[in-house]
């Protein structure tokens, strides 16, 4: 079955995170949540921070989050080297997405159950995020803040929710 469009999963219902009860839950497809200069002593010289803040609440599937991470990391590692930035994804995709598969062909009413046993099969994972929460941060030196902003702008294009990029000093980050 192909992947359903993101509009099917954009709205928040309730979190479904208990992996103990979910058999066959898909794994998280994001290999790394921290990239670049990950050691604390290497990050001491970074004074500027670019923050990607979500403006509307909703769900972001792990596919979109991984695409955003790849775009930001690819740009930053090409323009700067890995030791000149720190990229971190703040949120973790705990929510498991289920799908009650429906057949759409002639005679399908004899093959499927309809709404009987409509719990669904786990098909993916997502982040449930509230308005104003931080999704990604990039720490850089002052001279590289335009590159951090461009990286988050490229990542923002891959996300289904509207986002805002904020530029701050390292000591002023909230939430």
From Swiss-Prot:
Highest rank taxon of the organism: Archaea
A GO term from the CC aspect: ribonucleoprotein complex
GO biological process, one term: translation
An example molecular function term from Gene Ontology annotations: structural constituent of ribosome
Statement: the UniProt record of this protein carries the keyword Secreted: no
One Pfam assignment: Ribosomal_L16
Ribonucleoprotein as UniProt keyword: yes
Keywords, comma-separated and alphabetical: Ribonucleoprotein, Ribosomal protein
Annotated InterPro entries: Ribosomal_uL16, Ribosomal_uL16_arc, Ribosomal_uL16_euk_arch, Ribosomal_uL16_sf
Similarity comment: family membership: Belongs to the universal ribosomal protein uL16 family.
NCBIfam families reported for this sequence: PRK04199.1-4 (NF003239)
Name of the molecule in the record: Large ribosomal subunit protein uL16
Encoding gene per record: rpl10e
